[in-house]
Amino acid sequence: MPHRTQRYSKIGDTMKTIDLSGKWNYKTDIDDSQTIDSIKFENNNFNLPGSTCDNRIGKKTEYFDKISKEAVRAPRERYEYIAPLWLQKTVSIPNDTDGKTVRLFMERVNISSELWIDGVKTDRQIIELSTPHIYNLTGKITPGEHTFTLKIDNRNLLNLDTMASGYSVDTQGYWNGVIGRIELQYEEKEHIDSIQVYTDDKGITLKVVETSDVHSPFKTEKATVTVNVTSPKGDLLGEKIFETKVFNSKQVDYFRYDISEMNYWDEFNPNLYTATVKYECNGHTDIKSVKFGMRTIKTENKKILLNNRQISLRGTIDCAIYPLTGYPPMDIEVWRKNFKTIKSYGLNHVRFHAWCPPECAFNAADEIGMYISVEMSLWLNHDVCALETGEDPIHRQYFMQEAINISKTYGNHPSFIMFSNGNENMGDFDMLNDITTCIKAYDNRRIYTLTTNFDHPIMPCEDYLCAYEAGGHNVRIQNCQDKAAENTSLDYSSAVKDVPVPIISFEVGQYCVYPDVDLIEKYTGNILPVNLDAIKKFMIEKNVYHKLNDYIKASGDLAVKLYKEDIEAALRTKDFGGFELLSLSDYTGQSTATVGILDVFYESKGLISHDEFKNFAGEAVPLFKAKRIFKNTDTLEAELDLYDFGEKKINNPVYNLTVQNGKQVFYKTSTTESKVSIPLNSITKSTMLSVILEVNGYKNTWRIFVFAENKIENNVRMIKSEEELDDIIKNGGKAIVMKECFKNPIHGSFIPVFWSPVHFPSQKPCGAIIDNKHRIFDDFPTEKYPDYQWKRLLDNSVGTDISKFAGEVKPIIETVPNFFDNTASSPLFETEIGKAKLLFCGFDLDGDYPECKQLLSSITQYVNSDKF
């Protein structure tokens, strides 16, 4: 027998619900051949809310035998099912539903639903990704037992292609089912249909949609609307009563409520008010409440103004990757945890990348004070998809309605401050412009842009631009890494000058951190990490699995350094709108893009603490602008600055600057001046200096390198030909073997793989591991992992596969390979071949720059000593 246990609850005064969660009968329909008349239900153990994967329905996913592009594409659902699914349940409808408004509410469905009651089709098919599926059953259902039949179809019915985070194997997958609340709702015909709260600097305007039994132009009903507002502390601010006349079955009224002493909502004080509306009409009363925050947002003079105060967005991206469920969490505690984690790293903003999260995510963001940007599941351009925006005519109508639905459903949330139609769209910008113009006119409670990414002429409806280029200028470091390596002064002021709206730097970072294949054991839910398993097998095959932790730490250290520079470039730019990282946490799709400081479970990889990260990504960040590399005959000229977007402005900041040489203080000052000059001529040995700048308790650090005059040992033999190499091997001696003799050379790079070595094919490595205690570095300052003194050296280097050498090889510098290569290569290593003692050096030591000359000096002194 079907499971009929139902739970009843009340919302407000009149609305009741019947909980339809629990066991449903189900039937698969792989070839979409079933109809309501032919379908036969044989199973009664499908649990809702839940997905087919939750219920172990579909083709079981197996691990791949070996690495391949397909194997590392993304983790997969343990059970894959992409087809219609039929669900059925007998529901007991109570007597008090008679004459009432009745709805079936399903909080989130992927991607379409159809409903039959007792075999009769009810309403149209609903295709909706971002908001609840709601069926109006008023007048279509009577008290007693009824059979509800659902058809859920997760096929690509909207021609979305495969990229948008709301519908992609790379992100949340193609799950089939119903998640969140599933319930029957019923209430009097005279009820409040919706409440929208519009805030300004004097109070609120309530848009209330009231329903009634008025269906004739010759009939009206008198109604009373009473509004109460409760403060964030729970104090009742007062009651206002409005008399109105109802002319339609669904009527819109606007009511004004002024608030004299406001507690604004923002990242520091996420104050939430409650508006309670009582609607009395035709002898019936309905009471509904809505939480809201007193906040306004606009852009003006290239600034984003929240509550008339400039804000700066420090964000990360959520791409709908949730490996335990395989679909968005419908539990507010998950969102609270994630947002608190993000905030602990100094960030205040989350962009939902080509998807819209569920209600509980907004609730958590409201509570915690997180600024949210929402997008539709729209990502179409010919660079990555078969379609461009607008090529499918259904998209204009669908996405216009989708934008309205998102605004209606989530628009009251103060955290919801930004809206974009989608990610990296190209094609019909007339369509995007029409949608944005209409939705902005419909709801002015947030700021808007046509699409996230791609430089373009700013439309009148656009409030900001989020892109990696703006006005023809770079606004992320990816394409200006050489300049960033020279100094800590890079900014995007030229872009700000040329673009009329605030600029947000798009998807900053994307630096590949070697994937932690031991995370496989964390995947205890619906998602099978086939990609990590394939990479692990490949590591074992290449005999590098034992180096996993070293690879993660080295590549992660480099990623942290580069993220720091990317972030600080944005912070240095006056009136810059902000940045959005890709990403604080890993992206596991698109060929395994493990680019995060956190893993996909929002847990630390141990690369940097949240407090250390916050030092350069938080609300107030001291900034030190200077060259990175000096000669000891130079003077260090630096500019001191402060990025200041904390709750309270730091007026007349005092800069406490300390420069350390090892444990010794080399220079120290406390000043209100923005410029300092530090002579370096007292430094006699090449060294790394640590710079610590503190302002009002906020601290930030940098490293700079000072090179003293170097001594070159000219009597060291340097071999550049095979003939010379054969000679020394045969006759004996010691020498440096230069890169001209490297067989099958592997080109080096300081900057690691971008995103994924498979998604964007690349042979680049992901960092290096340096034996910094080796005597070869007695006169060259370095730590275990390279800093910017290695940038030009590594970019002009080659390595070779040291596993191919027959004898013992002692790597001094070991390259961290990318996971699709896993070659154990080195640009600097020692070995003995025949009678020769050799140092293989893949660096170009002829460069006319300080760090190159110093490395040459340090290497030649080592080779010419008895230490070699």
Roles of regions detected by a PLM:
Residues 18, 24-31, 55, 77-192, ...:
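Accessory beta-strand-rich segments of carbohydrate-active enzymes
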Residues 1-68, 151, 155-156, 184, ...:
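Accessory carbohydrate-binding/adhesion or oligomerization-edge regions at the termini
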Residues 442, 741-744, 756-851:
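Catalytic beta-strand/loop cores that center a nucleophilic Ser/Cys/Thr
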Residues 342, 349-599:
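Substrate-binding/catalytic cleft of secreted carbohydrate-active enzymes
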Residues 142-145, 209, 213-298, 674-677, ...:
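Extended acidic/polar, glycine-enriched regions
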Residues 716-756, 835-837, 841:
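Short alpha-beta junction capping motif
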Residues 57, 62-92, 100-105, 110-116, ...:
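Active-site-adjacent substrate/metal-binding segments within catalytic domains
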